[in-house]
Amino acid sequence: MGISTVLALSLLWGPALSQGQWIPYTTYHDSVSSPGAPVETTTTEVFPSGLELRLANGGDRCQGRVEVLYQGSWGTVCDDGWDINDAQVVCRQLGCGMAVSAPGSARFGQGPGQIVLDDVSCSGQEPYLWSCHHRGWLSHNCGHQEDAGVICSDAMAMTSPPPDTWPTTVIYESTPHFPSGLELVFPSGLELRLANGSDRCQGRVEVLYQGSWGTVCDDGWDINDAQVVCRQLGCGMAVSAPGSARFGQGPGQIVLDDVSCSGQEPYLWSCHHRGWLSHNCGHQEDAGVICSDAVPTTTPPPDTWPTTVIYESSPVFPSGLELRLANGSDRCQGRVEVLYQGSWGTVCDDGWDINDAQVVCRQLGCGTAVSAPGSARFGQGPGQIVLDDVSCSGQEPYLWSCHHRGWLSHNCGHQEDAGVICSDAMAMTTPLPDTWPTTVIHESTPVFPSGLELQLANGSDRCQGRVEVLYQGTVCDDGWDINDAQVVCRQLGCGMAVSAPGSARFGQGPGQIVLDDVSCSGQEPYLWSCHHRGWLSHNCGHQEDAGVICSDAMAMTTPPPDTWPTTVIYESTPHFPSGLELRLANGSDRCQGRVEVLYQGSWGTVCDDGWDINDAQVVCRQLGCGTAVSAPGSARFGQGPGQIVLDDVSCSGQEPYLWSCHHRGWLSHNCGHQEDAGVICSGAMDTTTPLPDTWPTTVIYESTPVHISGLQLRLVNGSDRCEGRVEVLYQGSWGTVCDDSWDLNDASVVCRQLGCGTALSAPASAQFGQSSGSIVLDDVSCSGSEPNLWSCSHRGWLSHNCGHHEDAGVVCSGPDSRLAVRLVNGSTRCQGRVEVLYRGSWGTVCDDSWDINDASVVCRQLGCGWAVSAPGSARFGQGSGSIFLDEVSCSGQEPYLWNCSHRGWLSHNCGHYEDAGVICSDGWTTVTPPAPTTDWWEPTVTTTVGPSSNCGGFLYNATGSFSSPSYPGYYPNNALCVWEIAVPSGYLINLGFSQLRLEQHSYCNFDYVEIFDGSTDSSLLGKICNDSGQIFTTSSNRMTVLFRSDISVQNTGFLAWYNSFPRDASLRLVSGNSSYGACAGRVEIYHGGRWGTVCDDSWDTQDAQVVCRQLQCGDAVSAPGGAYFGSGSGPITLDDVNCSGTEATLWQCRSQSWFSHNCGHHEDASVICTGNYGTTTASVPNISTSNASYSCGGFLSQHSGRFSSPFYPGNYPNNARCVWDIEVQNNYQVTVTFTDVQLEGGCQYDYIEVFDGPYHSSPLIARVCDGARGSFTSSSNFLSVRFVSDGSITRRGFQAEFYSLPSNDSTNLLCLMNHMQASVSRAYLQSLGFSAWELVVSGWNGNYQCQRQITPSQVIFTIPYSGCGTIKQVDNETITYSNFLKAAVSSGVIKRKKDLHIHVSCRMLQDSWVHTMYIANDTIEVSEVQYSNFNVNVSFYTSSSFSYPVTSSPYYVDLDQNLYLQAEILHSDASLALFVDTCVASPNPNDFTSVTYDLIRSGCVRDETYRSYAQPSPRVVRFRFNSFHFLNRFPAVYLRCKMVVCRAYDYSSRCYRGCVVRSKRDVGSYQERVDVVLGPIQLLDPPAGKKSPGKGSP
């Protein structure tokens, strides 16, 4: 039986937390020295403001204390956050090789000057230390005892020949060139060796440190660490990295622990580790290594063998490992076989994919992998299976370097032998030589079929045209995009890809179509390196020939020469001219202006073609001007006078220099100075010039890749300037934009460009009317971050395939608009009619398509928990305002309701009788209104607003919450927000923080929250910037909360809550029994002259702890509910109390509003404290039931019923694990309703789970927690409910009811013994436009079995499991039989309706058959799941011939008589196998746990008379045993046998594993587990005088 296991990975996606702020310097230098230039003494390159770097107080210039020359004085760097990445930048900048370590704590002594840098955080790639993120110049919170240091690898190098006594470690790494007179000194003799192995390339890892050899601990030791060791010792590649002292325990010290290498380091000690001689392990964990050059040897290595030698080697793997492809048409395709221990074996296809095949093809020198077929595509191999679960990244040098299950370890058969087809398999025209090696080791450059070339045909020059490949043929445009074109342009040396036209833009090719479904990342070296369908495999015609236009196609003025190569391969190593410098000219300071580069002694400009924020980022970083603010083009800072030195610059933003970016070539351009590029960096000074009064509606800050002057943008035909039809001014005329692929990202760019706030919707289909002008843009695709609309990807100016009926529109929020949502007319703030504040007015939402996902967004936005239901039809009354939204469709993950897809603002086709509502979990009760005698007020509606407007406000509810701007996103700099809270007179206010994360400071001087006891003129209750858990309480009915942030360092901010309570509130305990004393009883609260009670919803010991402390009664012993001390008589004052346990008073805890509840006095809460137990004889009541025996879970098969937690309504036990399986008749659905749920608070402790089928293999419908109620419905006839409790705190538990109703009657599926029966409603077919005669089985070949049977209401198909095209799919856990019904449009030239595909499948799972039916997504989807039992026939037979079954019941036998049993699977599939796992005898057919006798258990024979017989087929099992002696004491006996169903001949499955002693779980896979009960068996009356009967013959 199969167990379907789904592993869900939840990625917590959140903003990275910044530890500091980059503060640029602002001085200006006309020249910047070339990186890498020689330096004098200990200084490196000179930067603006005279920045220099050195290492001081070390043994040489490449180790020491880090010092920076800043403003003319040397200062140090603090070690806060200092690590190997920071040290790497220092070493590179000083030309000192690689970083070896990054010591802190003033390892090289304390420096005398200032501390100039702190909190330095480098990625390791920066060109200069001050390019890294840091706290700011001279800003720190440390002393010189934390001065940072660095040790670089060149600190260990020598410039003079080594002495005769040179250690055994030889370093061949190259030494950088420095000015004469510098000598680099080696530190104290670090060496490396492998000890106690059979040769020098395998053994225990040992390091010579401070003159003694020591070992390395295996904590974290892996193949990457071993790789470094093998390379350092010149021993080839790492084969394995054994730990646990595989090569014996070493005698010396443990010198390294927690070693973590990337695999690229030059020395083992270059890797990250715990520190020298620092460890937490013993020698039993000594690490080892086996390298590929390890070879068996019978003599010890020579005494003079060096322990570390660096040289190149050709790996020869141990024990003669080889690789070949067998049974293919040539050596480059076939079944994968590995020579292991002298024999060829195969590789299993589990997890086998193109990455694995890539390694095989490279290893054999067969080019790149074309495909990775499994399922013994090249026949089943004869030998062993040597590898399984192979998982390669594609970069490994050998197949056995990949991760795998282990040699000769597998769970598969030869029917799963893996194969490979390499690219060179198709180019072989001559037979293979007899001496062809089976394993050839080549360099990693791919070898492709001979003679492959690439060209662009039928274009105006060699860099544009139809893509053709020799194999001469074309490429199909299926999936063809700009990434594919990029590879073509790079391969041909034609610059960057401009566009990737399809549909035979350059004419239809005459030859073959050689490639289809090409999918490139854009980084591949050749087009045929990209993923594709396979050579000459396609499903297209030449009308789909793909084309390319490259950037160099636009600069060609002469025809290409006849000898122009069709494929040009360039070297990827950049070469820069000498003397390059960079500056920004003609701006108000050095950090803004026109970009100029000093090239060949003259300053020149950069063209703005393709110029964007990434390019500007490189400029700003290179000049030390902070981050890029904008990248203006069109000579924003005036036209430059010199040459144009660079054009088509394209940076990723990470490059160290502007000229490191991809560009057209030096002095190569197609532009003029009117397109000079500019940059504005964050380090630029603010301008004081006011903006002109005539500011246009479109301001162009950024340049566009197509250089057209006068571009503008507007929205027309809307109610104001921030909504309407999108129009662009192009070449002097206004034109529209087509709505093809138009979405909210595109609209966001428009709204931001026009200064109109955020995008609310992106209406299409000319919602704002059709224009009469040109259509200037089509197929616009924005990421949402572009500076203007024309920066987005589009089809090209004036290129389109649409009409004005597709004009795109936009609705923006407006520059000063405020959006909010609220729930009105409900009994609490968390239920009611949904209303939205839009442009100053409240309006409703229509219920068309309104569902639980939409409600979820509303509940989360309002802080009301999760959505319980989404009622429509004006459940909460009809609204009176506008209807703002209709056809809302949310995924449930959106932050605000208006982010969901909808029809458009104020666009609807409904009335207020369809107003949508929401009920959230925090408001899912009917609240009893307060009595007229109280002084409580009518609750008001709480609203929440979007991030643009949630900075401050007036709060006037009894309880509520608010947050910092954009929470949980980062709050802005320079924020000042003020919230005023006011409650009725006579009430006080509590304020607490659920989350609080601000910039940290001991005095809260930067970002902080201030709480005032009234207005801001009142006394200060507190000033906080970190989460102390404190609750602030006012002395009046008013409170003011102020939040302020400074100009730097943002964080996620805070989420605050508040509640209110009467000033005269007091507390007591009432027990009615004096023996309990004053510290135990019913909790009562006084207010307004009356005592009231507290409801026990969510009441626990944390709440009780607050009560006990407030009354000075010691600690809480228990928190009984259910009116344990009797029911009170006054009002119910509080409900849903939720204390952390640290509050000073009960009313500081969070709860519902006072007198708001959904309970009665039978739920009054109580407390028992420790206070008086020392002076009373009364015992503490025991309310725990955790030690009592109980029944838990079960199988429910009736039409309806009820179940509950153990001991309900008493407290359930701890550590409960209960599962109820509810199965009803086929084609019915199950609904379960929870009528009472009282569990421990917090859904991670005690909870209920509802599954859509068996719980171990089905999707989770819902997790039900304390206080939640609701109904949940299955999609099939099976539903599981699982209850879990932890080891502490129990409560009353839950009660649930269930019932079943018929599912939809459109489709129906039954999985029977020999076939599946599918029925489709004729009415359903008619509704889709099909007749009953058009529906057929897809694989029907005329077989009468598959013909349809048409009744007046149904079309019925009988589909055998082994015919009519039924497909059988198997894996280790399931067997699935699949087919599908189809109805297609088969006549005419065009069609106006979709084809119909109804997929049907029967899948065997653990305890039942799963029946699924669905319709493919080219039509409406319909799903049905049905469960039924698997059929196995078990019978007694009269003899070992198994010819005649026993038909009588009871079956009367003699004592010790041979009994013969046969079991058989009743199913038409002949490829199933049956196995007897367990057989147990009992005198009671309903109790197999009390008095039992084991015949066989877990496949292990327990009865001496048990004997199995040969199986006539895998689906039949036969065995015998003798009647039992204990039958003398009982009138009858019953057998219960557990049978296991598996795949036949799957020797890894349970059916072929025999006796297995299980300790934790079942071993081996199977498809089905079947429990069978047989009997009764009764003894015959024994003949007189018979005393010792003998056993019968076998």
UniProtKB/Swiss-Prot annotation:
What broad class describes the main subcellular location of this protein?
secreted
Q: Which UniProt keywords apply?
A: Developmental protein, Differentiation, Disulfide bond, Glycoprotein, Protein transport, Repeat, Secreted, Signal, Transport
User: According to its UniProt record, how is this protein modified after translation?
Assistant: Highly N- and O-glycosylated. The O-glycans are heavily sulfated.
Location relative to the cell: Secreted
- Biological processes per GO annotation: cell differentiation; cell-cell junction maintenance; defense response to Gram-negative bacterium; defense response to Gram-positive bacterium; protein transport
Which molecular-function annotation in GO is an example for this chain?
A: zymogen binding
Which residue windows are coiled coil? none
Q: Which domain of life is it from?
A: Eukaryota
Which residue numbers delimit the ZP domain? 1310-1558
Q: Where is the signal peptide?
A: 1-20
Q: Which family does it belong to?
A: Belongs to the DMBT1 family.
Q: Subunit notes for this chain?
A: Interacts with LGALS3. Binds SFTPD and SPAR in a calcium-dependent manner.
Write down what this protein is called: Scavenger receptor cysteine-rich domain-containing protein DMBT1
